Regions:
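Conserved acidic residues
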Residues: 82, 150-151, 176
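Conserved SAM-binding loop of SAM-dependent methyltransferases across substrates and taxa
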Residues: 91-103
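S-adenosyl-L-methionine
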Residues: 1-78, 111-151
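Conserved class I S-adenosyl-L-methionine
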Residues: 81-90
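A short SAM/SAH-binding and catalytic strip from SAM-dependent methyltransferases
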Residues: 149-162
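Conserved SAM-binding motif I beta-strand of class I
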Residues: 104-110
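C-terminal substrate-binding/active-site "lid" region of AdoMet-derived donor-dependent transferases
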Residues: 159-230
């Protein structure tokens, strides 16, 4: 491959992809599909640019509508608007889009990634927050909002970290549904304990028919709830 030509293609791909999100705010499924058909080879550097600006899930209008629909499908004992607690929200991009869809979202993050190496770590991520973000540890956030939260969103929990398992245990303890965005067991999110708990104690289902992962990535969006026989 001609290296100069490839670099030019990458620049074009990045510019087009950036335009999809800056000019249209949130592109459609068809726009993203068209982009992948045109620039599949250049998608890896573009993913890096997207992740450091917005976050790991590739969001479209349809995906946000599907997440909103899944949240609204949950039984809310008190009536009214459901409250969403987003943990480890990064830039707050997902939460900001759900707010625009009428959701009541509390976005939280401990911001530990800001202390990472900007070259080899996450120190250069998310220079622009998209909504108000409360700086608090994930488990502390659950304890603080357990009586308000109807659903917890956990997106791309760190690989081999026990955090996802601890969060899921808290969700089960307090009967709070979870929306999990990430890869399955053997992928790059969560750890074995997290997936063991999910298999043994939870029901899960896809909530997005339109989600498109970046090439080489195998994430999807799941609604995770306690198995009915375990609900007291």
């Amino acid at each position: 491959m001609n290296n100069k030509f490839y670099k030019e293609e990458v620049v074009m791909a990045c510019d087009w992809f950036s335009d999809l999100y800056t000019n249209k705010r949130l592109p459609s499924h068809d726009c993203i599909s068209k982009w992948f058909n045109e620039y599949y080879v250049e998608s890896f550097p573009v993913r890096n640019a997207y992740v450091t600006t917005f976050g790991f899930p590739l969001l479209t209008k349809e995906v946000i509508a599907e997440i909103t629909s899944a949240i609204n499908s949950l039984v809310h004992v008190g009536g009214g608007v459901l409250t969403v607690l987003e943990l480890c929200c990064g830039s707050g991009y997902l939460g900001s889009l759900l707010k625009e869809n009428g959701m009541n979202v509390i976005c939280t993050d401990n911001n530990a990634w800001k202390n990472d190496d900007p070259v080899h770590g996450h120190g250069n991520f998310f220079q622009k927050p998209y909504t108000e973000i409360e700086e608090i540890d994930a488990l502390e956030a659950i304890e603080k909002y357990k009586d308000k939260a109807d659903v917890i969103i956990l997106s791309w929990p760190e690989y081999e970290s026990e955090l996802a398992a601890r969060v899921l245990e808290k969700c089960l303890e307090y009967n709070i549904s979870m929306i999990y965005i990430g890869e399955r067991e053997g992928g790059c999110t969560g750890d074995d304990e997290f997936f063991d708990i999910m298999e043994e104690r939870c029901n899960e289902r896809f909530i997005s028919d339109s989600y498109i992962p970046f090439p080489g990535i195998h994430d999807n969006i799941y609604l995770v709830t306690k198995k009915p026989e375990l609900v007291k």
